[in-house]
């Protein structure tokens, strides 16, 4: 099936979905209605672009016909030639756009995410930088209209982040933040550095799609759940009732501790969300490691320890090592204006996937 047959099939299905979504039997079936609504939303951009493309093709045909009929009318002929030139350029742009829109979709792209940030190499400075990254993602989420909820956090003595786990919810969160997993390196002069020397520290970021219970069911026999008293600063118990939850997935050893909420049930629910995402991600990563060829055609190697980006404060520079992108906009990017970096990563990934399909 060539690209035009594929596009026509997508348009035919889109029209069929429109009819199905107005069918009373479908409307009364909430689950099916939601599934079909999601499918319609996912194909809408492709169908809109395809219809605009067909209009451009018609405009080209009309302009060519006008040029034939414009003999003796130089002004009309010139106008038709200009329209033909513009329409042919638009045709090429639409063809590239449609190729990208037809690329296989990542099934996780529309999902919310679990975001984990940890200070790594560099002690206090690494923890402070982890805090900077947390602020950057929080502000970026605001620009996108997403909800950002810190689920679990651990700070050090200087106010840095030892570890933070957050849920980011909204439209297409995973599609934009999935490229953030990896090691983020910072180069700057620490506040405690009296000689003015630049130090290098690292924080790690992990982005996992939220996993619903219906998508990945963990056998309760594989979980060990401990209930204990939440502790505050200095280690003192802050609750008379045991509300904190420690959850361990026995087969993998993955552990989650949750004490942010005031009730045991809320802590249990949040811990379950995180452990479900981590366990699903653990097995997905094993499967991904077995697909080296596919991984080479996407952004980076997929290695969670891979250094993906450097933030150089003295030079106000951010470098993404996977795509060779360097921007002298560190202050802007850390303030949450990440679109230029993320758009470049998305475009690079799409280009590589197109090349892979064409080979």
Swiss-Prot record:
InterPro entries: PCRF, Pep_chain_release_fac_I, Pep_chain_release_fac_I_sf, Prokaryotic/Mito_RF, RF-1. Belongs to the prokaryotic/mitochondrial release factor family. Its main location: cytoplasm. Peptide chain release factor 1 directs the termination of translation in response to the peptide chain termination codons UAG and UAA. GO terms for cellular component: cytoplasm. It is found in: Cytoplasm. The keyword Protein biosynthesis applies. One of its GO terms (molecular function) is translation release factor activity, codon specific. Coiled coil: none annotated. Methylated by PrmC. Methylation increases the termination efficiency of RF1. Keywords: Cytoplasm, Methylation, Protein biosynthesis. This is Peptide chain release factor 1. The keyword Nucleotide-binding does not apply. NCBIfam families: prfA, PRK00591.1. The gene is prfA. The modification N5-methylglutamine is found at residue 236.
């Amino acid at each position: 099936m060539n690209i035009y047959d594929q596009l026509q099939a997508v348009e035919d299905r889109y029209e069929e979905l429109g009819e199905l979504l107005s069918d009373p039997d479908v409307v009364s079936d909430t689950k099916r209605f939601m599934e079909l609504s999601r499918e319609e939303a996912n194909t809408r951009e492709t169908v809109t672009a395809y219809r605009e493309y067909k209009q451009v093709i018609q405009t080209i045909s009309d302009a060519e016909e006008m040029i034939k009929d414009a003999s003796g009318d130089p002004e009309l002929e010139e106008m038709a030639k200009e329209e033909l030139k513009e329409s042919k350029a638009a045709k090429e742009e639409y063809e590239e756009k449609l190729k990208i829109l037809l690329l296989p979709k990542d099934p996780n792209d529309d999902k919310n995410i679990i975001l984990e940030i940890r200070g790594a190499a560099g002690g206090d400075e690494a923890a402070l930088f982890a805090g900077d990254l947390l602020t950057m993602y929080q502000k970026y989420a605001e620009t996108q209209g997403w909800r950002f909820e810190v689920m679990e956090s651990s700070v050090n003595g200087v106010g840095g982040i030892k570890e933070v786990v957050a849920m980011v919810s909204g439209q297409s969160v995973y599609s934009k933040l999935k490229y953030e997993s990896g090691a983020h390196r910072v180069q700057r002069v620490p506040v405690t550095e009296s000689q003015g020397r630049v130090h290098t520290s690292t924080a790690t970021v992990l982005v996992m799609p939220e996993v619903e219970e219906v998508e990945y069911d963990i056998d309760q026999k594989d979980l060990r759940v401990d209930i204990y008293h939440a502790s505050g600063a200095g280690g003192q118990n802050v609750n008379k009732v045991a509300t904190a939850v420690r959850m361990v997935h026995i087969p993998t050893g993955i552990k989650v501790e949750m004490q942010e909420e005031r009730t045991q049930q809320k802590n249990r629910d949040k811990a379950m969300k995180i452990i479900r995402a981590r366990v699903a991600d653990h097995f997905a990563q094993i499967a991904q490691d077995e697909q080296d060829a596919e991984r080479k055609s996407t952004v980076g190697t997929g290695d969670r320890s891979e250094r993906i980006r450097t933030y150089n404060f003295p030079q106000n520079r951010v470098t993404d090592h996977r795509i060779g992108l360097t921007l002298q906009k560190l202050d802007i990017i850390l303030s949450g204006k990440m679109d230029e970096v993320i758009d470049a990563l998305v475009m690079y990934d799409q280009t590589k996937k197109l090349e892979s399909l064409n080979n």
